[in-house]
Amino acid sequence: MIDVNKFESMQIGLASPDKIRSWSYGEVKKPETINYRTLKPEKQGLFDERIFGPTKDYECACGKYKRIRYKGRVCDRCGVEVTSAKVRRERMGHIELAAPVSHIWYFKGIPSRMGLVLDMSPRSLEEVIYFASYVVLDPGDTPLEKKQLLTEAEYRDKKAEYGDRFKAEMGAAAIQKLLADVDLEKEAAELKEELKEATGQKRTRAIRRLDILEAFIKSGNKPEWMVMDVIPVMPPDLRPMVQLEGGRFATSDLNDLYRRVINRNNRLKRLLKLQAPGIIVQNEKRMLQEAVDALIDNGRRGRPVAGPGNRPLKSLSHLLKGKQGRFRQNLLGKRVDYSGRSVIDVGPSLKLNQMGLPVPMALELFKPFIMHELVKRGLSANVKSAKRKIDRSDDDVFDVLEDVIKEHPVLLNRAPTLHRLGIQAFEPILVSGKSMRLHPLVCSAYNADFDGDQMAIHVPLSDEAQAEARLLMLAAHHILSPRDGEPIVSPSQDMVIGNYYMTTEDKGREGEGMIFKDTDEAELAYRNDYVSLQTRVGVQVSAFPEKPFTDDQRGKIMVTTVGKLLFNRIMPKDFAYINEPTDANIQNGVDDRFFLEPGQDIHEYLENAPLVPPFKKGFLSDLIAEVYKRYKVTKTSQFLDRIKDLGYYESTISGLTTAMSDIHDLPEKPEILDKAQKQVTLITKQFRRGLITDDERYERVIGAWNDAKDEVQNKLIEHMDIHNPINMMSDSGARGNISNFTQLAGMRGLMASPNGKIMELPVKSNFYEGLSVLEMFISSHGARKGMTDTALKTANSGYLTRRLVDVAQDVVVREKDCGTDRGLEVTAITNGNEMIEPLYDRIMGRYTMKSVFDPKTGEKIVGKNVLIDEEMAQKIVDAGVKKVTIRSAFTCNTEHGVCERCYGRNAATGDRVEAGEAVGTVAAQSIGEPGTQLTLRNFHTGGVAGNDDITQGLPRIQEIVEARNPKGRATITEVTGEVVSIEENPAERTKDITIKGETDTRTYTLPITARMKVAEGDFIHRGAPLNEGSIDPKELIQVRDVLSTETYLLSQVQGVYRMQGIDLLDKHVEIMIRQMMRKVRVMDPGDTDLLPGQLMDISQFRDANKDTLVAGNIPATARPVILGITKAALETNSFLSAASFQETTRVLTDAAIRGKNDPLVGLKENVIIGKIIPAGTGMSAYRNIKPKEVSVAAYSIKDIEAKLKEEDKQN
């Protein structure tokens, strides 16, 4: 076997007949499979042992030679080689066809490859191949033309007229001869000449033909190989026949298809031998052609061949295609051993890097390790008895188990794995029961809850795998989300409400104004009921020597609460004392207003002091981010565990409950509803009098009811008591929000009808009062729509993620610095007056391209090529800088990836990104993962005339990344200049906008309903939109340059995500958009070998031009092209990656003709061939690092399996 990690690339091509024969171990001559009595394979049949190898390991068919010592001997009686039965998975056979047969992929594909080579239409080809017409092969001296088609009758007439002076044949044999006659070089040269003057349809066809002829010339494939004389037979173990209970057999469809081919082939041979009449032979040849077509791609032409129960048979093509095909089912995703799955349960007592593993699962997963340990300790004599001990659950086993799993990390995965945090490593802790325990804080990363979710567990076996799991994948390392760099492990639900309850302040509680020496004394008072957690007290600052107080503050008394004193105990020792939930408190310590002046009375101070709000969920998250920034992984994970324990403990102590009595009536509600009803009546009256249109009426009615609902909500908030448990729940961020409360105590408001439009009939009741039957019915539409939307959204979003991953999977950080001299100028992204993404978010964690200067003083804030951290970013924003030029993936020069400088900081660690980081996949996951949170609907801005529906949410993202023509398209100007006039033309319902540029004047016609973005007298730059709507990037790239198109797309994607409250870093979107812009289309090939109209990588184009320029010739010109992600993924340089993505047969057909070479650069193609992926520790730079041998060599699982086999043989 070749070592899969050694070879560099993989090539695909057309197989010549000789090649197919050289692969084969023998010809399959009979359609038989196995003998019905002996169940042994039949000789010369589809399962013949002489061709494909023995069915039993090291045993020939007749049983003369058994055992491994005869390995390699061919039995003189039955002719079977004595070898491992595994060879039946790799040895191929062949069938010698009695007549040539065309390969359906090359004849039927779009465009038909045979048709292009021969310059014949697919229809003519079909007529010839399936024996409907003759084709002239050699016209001789007759007036016929080569490749002319003749019907049966015409052929007979011509034969009578000219005799043997011309040659015409039918069937694949004729096509084979025509293909063999093609002089590729000559045809290509003629086409190149023709291209110089050809235009339109003719030119397109010429380019396509030239492309395919060049492919044949360059690859060395011969066109006649598209017609086959021999077909290979797949190894039998890949198309097995198995006995079911009840004596019946189940077989792969391929055996049926091969059988039909063999039957027809044998019949044809017999007919030819008998010299049967031409028409019978022709018919048999056609049937053979159809049988081979069905074998290769059943259903591609005509009706598919059906098996029992009218089910179409699965052909060779179907084995590769689709989710269940070879690529996606077996090569990209395999089932692995040493894995299990179970229901998950909450493990509140676990540490962040632990998980609870049920004992029965541990016994099974770590079996070989336990057996090794039992033998090593002398508790079992050999591996076999150790195995018996485990099966008996002997006491010795449990003594060993603890030690075996200690320090052996396991991986936990929850499907769907939407981002890389869907698989994390934990240290197992044994637990009783059958469910696995999961740490509550990692639930948000997995999107897990404990209502019956299941998770899968995997055991990394090798030392390297364990080391990687521990160092790179341990849950404690995954505190920040790679999507936006914010903490993803933040407390939720009980933990939040516990910490909220404990940091609440209250006026006039028992013991208010007591002054304590330190936290311990305050705790003592609390435990003895002198004070409550919410009591405001004083404490001497001198009790906190390590905390960063100012010298002035150190001698004073600080006002805080008992709960906050206890909360600050869990903070790192030298972290600021947290007394109020503000950023200033975290950064600069406690504000001076919380300190008593010497001699000041604390009771007097408390009379006037306002209550400080408690710590909510968002603040806890900020706190975690700051702790992580300062102390990194270990301290943060300990802090997280303390926050979790404290939260759970305090929420238990608090005894918070909710009941009907917590919901109060709203006395003002009838009055508010009455007012709204009157308004609606008035609006209806206006409509009846014709003062407003129906659309306006609808808008206003909806508005009136929405205002009423908002008013009810505001009144509710006014009446709300801070101690109301429902209020505490929503205010702290533990669960629910104000709108839930409005529906309980206020009114439900307007509902959506099944068609997505809002109904004018509001639900006036709330759940506390109860809904009427009609109201209940109206509400049910919305609920049902919500469920179906979610289901559809999941599928759409999953497919989007798959396409994104596919297009970006080969983007890896490959070098430190690409040395580019271009950068990206960034400003805050706004939409009108609305801020979409502030400058701070755009520059933080990026490298500067140019130095940044203060616009007022002119002093340098940040130099060039510096990584901007939070502090610098804040400085830049505070100085009033509006534009910063940063390094960006858009302008990075690294091939097949990006460099560290252009990428910037790794969001998941907060440090510089390291070479080998698979940033493309991370980017795709970061964009795809929140896809399910995006809305599925287009936002209806309502029916007001001219306000076209603007696509939002998931459909808009798909529109952008697939580079489709957007809905509600904006017209852009192609000239820079002044808007001279905007004239309305009511008769044709249009507006004409005239723009006068320096050299020319353009007039654009828009519909009268369009909402203008420009006014007369405005000066606008080319590429600017004239009306509201989305710009088509394909137009923009022609009018402006690539960078401005990329910037536009980036701002659009960010607009959609930020509208939904989802933060997403620019760099992820940049990587995806860069992948869409990798190609150029050659316009004029100059003196290069390129073809006009050819799509190619920018880097390849540059290389071709470089060589031409060095030789002193004319370079080619090309224009940039924007491809949708599906198209971009299919256009990748790797045929393996493209074939495993979509349109498998088309990709492989094309790759084979071109003799494509897959350089194995991306991750996917390496996974497919089983090579270690070239990212992370798999990069060549890291691959050659050898660890020092220190301890005894570790045993492997293979050793144990071998031992077991040995012991079996001895027994």
UniProtKB/Swiss-Prot annotation:
Positions bound to Zn(2+) 1: 60, 62, 75, 78
EC number(s) reported in the record: 2.7.7.6
Record-linked Pfam families: RNA_pol_Rpb1_1, RNA_pol_Rpb1_2, RNA_pol_Rpb1_3, RNA_pol_Rpb1_4, RNA_pol_Rpb1_5
Cofactor(s) in the UniProt record: Mg(2+); Zn(2+)
Entry GO MF terms: DNA binding; DNA-directed RNA polymerase activity; magnesium ion binding; zinc ion binding
Key words, A-Z: DNA-directed RNA polymerase, Magnesium, Metal-binding, Nucleotidyltransferase, Transcription, Transferase, Zinc
GO biological process, one term: DNA-templated transcription
Highest taxon above the source species: Bacteria
Binding residues annotated for Mg(2+), in chain numbering: 449, 451, 453
Record: residues binding Zn(2+) 2: 818, 892, 899, 902
Catalytic activity: RNA(n) + a ribonucleoside 5'-triphosphate = RNA(n+1) + diphosphate
Note accompanying the cofactor annotation: Binds 1 Mg(2+) ion per subunit.
InterPro entries named in the record: DNA-dir_RpoC_beta_prime, DNA-dir_RpoC_beta_prime_bact, RNA_pol_asu, RNA_pol_N, RNA_pol_Rpb1_1, RNA_pol_Rpb1_3, RNA_pol_Rpb1_3_sf, RNA_pol_Rpb1_4
Assigned GO CC terms: DNA-directed RNA polymerase complex
Subunit and partners: The RNAP catalytic core consists of 2 alpha, 1 beta, 1 beta' and 1 omega subunit. When a sigma factor is associated with the core the holoenzyme is formed, which can initiate transcription.
HAMAP family from the UniProt entry: RNApol_bact_RpoC
Family the UniProt entry places it in: Belongs to the RNA polymerase beta' chain family.
Function comment: DNA-dependent RNA polymerase catalyzes the transcription of DNA into RNA using the four ribonucleoside triphosphates as substrates.
Name of protein: DNA-directed RNA polymerase subunit beta'
Gene that specifies this protein: rpoC
